[in-house]
């Protein structure tokens, strides 16, 4: 078993991160496997070295050890572009210049409605024809979307998390209708979470992806990309989320739950485990 924890250095780690990291770490160790660490820093406007240093320190304080070097997405941008080039040459991605406002206006037209998918409003396809690759055209420096009508295939994945345990089938008609043409590269990043995460999990040999249940609906996108790119499909384990007193999912802006604050108040790693039920 190979698991991983993949935080973004865009703010302090909180109790929810501690739960995710400890769960992935302990699952791998209990199975005699490997636990890997990846820094997801493709959001170059928000990722900061000081947050990375803090999260590494917090993980060590929790007693979490990882195998091998830390993988940083910022070091892998050429590999993401290479995958996009291959998809572009196959006619599976297209250029999109729509703003968020454009998409909202098109999707709310009476004849369209506004269906919601894992990434929000399902893209209405405004740029699908005009943005498609032309013979000899280089990969454009715009947002790039996946042509789900060409990419989707009958497939599925195994889920071991408590809320969704079992085999989940993925059907092309559902992907086209309920997910749509997702963004694979944002103009300002040159990639996206969806593309990077599947390439990185394959590169690191991850066999079991553990993550919060808020990402369960995105798994169909990731498995579709894995099939499309000839990558292995791992087992998925989506766990429950740590929530605040009002029942809201913790976010990095919830500084009251930051691990650094608990540490400053004298909490021990064992105290953190008790707080999160591990």
UniProtKB/Swiss-Prot annotation:
Sequence motif 'KMSKS' region, residues: 249-253
Lineage: superkingdom: Bacteria
Protein EC: 6.1.1.-
GO MF, any single term: ATP binding
Keywords assigned by UniProt, alphabetized: Aminoacyl-tRNA synthetase, ATP-binding, Ligase, Metal-binding, Nucleotide-binding, Zinc
GO annotation, biological process: glutamyl-tRNA aminoacylation
InterPro entries: aa-tRNA-synth_I_CS (IPR001412), Glu/Gln-tRNA-synth (IPR000924), Glu/Gln-tRNA-synth_Ib_cat-dom (IPR020058), GluQ/Sye (IPR049940), Rossmann-like_a/b/a_fold (IPR014729)
Binding site for ATP: 252
EC category name: ligase
Motif 'HIGH' region, residue numbers: 7-17
GO CC, any one term: cytosol
Cofactor(s), names only, from the UniProt record: Zn(2+)
Record: residues binding Zn(2+): 96, 98, 123, 127
Cofactor binding note from Swiss-Prot or TrEMBL: Binds 1 zinc ion per subunit.
Keyword Plastid part of the UniProt annotation: no
Record: residues binding L-glutamate: 4-8, 40, 193, 211
Keyword Transmembrane on entry: no
Protein family according to the UniProt entry: Belongs to the class-I aminoacyl-tRNA synthetase family. GluQ subfamily.
Function of the protein: Catalyzes the tRNA-independent activation of glutamate in presence of ATP and the subsequent transfer of glutamate onto a tRNA(Asp). Glutamate is transferred on the 2-amino-5-(4,5-dihydroxy-2-cyclopenten-1-yl) moiety of the queuosine in the wobble position of the QUC anticodon.
PANTHER family linked to this entry: GLUTAMATE--TRNA LIGASE, GLUTAMYL-Q TRNA(ASP) SYNTHETASE
Official protein name in the record: Glutamyl-Q tRNA(Asp) synthetase
Organism of derivation: Rhodobacter capsulatus (strain ATCC BAA-309 / NBRC 16581 / SB1003)
Lineage: Bacteria, Pseudomonadati, Pseudomonadota, Alphaproteobacteria, Rhodobacterales
Gene coding for it: gluQ
């Amino acid at each position: 078993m190979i698991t991983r924890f993949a935080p973004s250095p865009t703010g302090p780690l909180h109790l929810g991160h501690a739960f995710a990291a400890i769960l992935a770490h302990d699952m791998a160790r209990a199975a005699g496997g490997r636990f890997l660490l990846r820094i997801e820093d493709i959001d170059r406007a928000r990722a900061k070295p000081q947050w990375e240093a803090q999260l590494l320190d917090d993980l060590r304080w929790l007693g979490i050890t990882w195998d091998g070097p830390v993988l940083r997405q910022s070091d892998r941008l050429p590999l993401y572009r290479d995958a996009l080039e291959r998809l572009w040459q196959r006619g599976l991605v297209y250029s999109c210049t729509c703003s968020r406002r454009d998409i909202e206006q098109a999707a709310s037209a009476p004849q369209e409605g506004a269906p919601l998918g894992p990434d929000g409003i399902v893209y209405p396809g405004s740029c699908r024809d005009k943005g498609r690759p032309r013979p000899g055209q280089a990969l454009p420096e715009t947002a790039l979307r996946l042509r789900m009508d060409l990419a989707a295939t009958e497939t599925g994945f195994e889920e071991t998390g408590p809320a969704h345990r079992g085999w989940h089938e993925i059907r092309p008609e559902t992907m086209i209708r309920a997910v749509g043409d997702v963004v694979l590269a944002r103009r300002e990043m040159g990639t996206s979470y969806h593309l990077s995460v599947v390439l990185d999990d394959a590169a690191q040999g991850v066999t079991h992806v553990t993550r919060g249940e808020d990402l369960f609906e995105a798994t169909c996108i990731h498995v579709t990309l894995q099939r499309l790119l000839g990558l292995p499909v791992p087992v998925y384990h989506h766990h429950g989320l740590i929530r605040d007193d009002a029942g809201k999912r913790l976010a990095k802006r919830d500084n009251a739950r930051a691990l650094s604050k608990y540490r400053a108040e004298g909490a021990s790693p064992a105290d953190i485990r008790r707080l999160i039920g591990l």
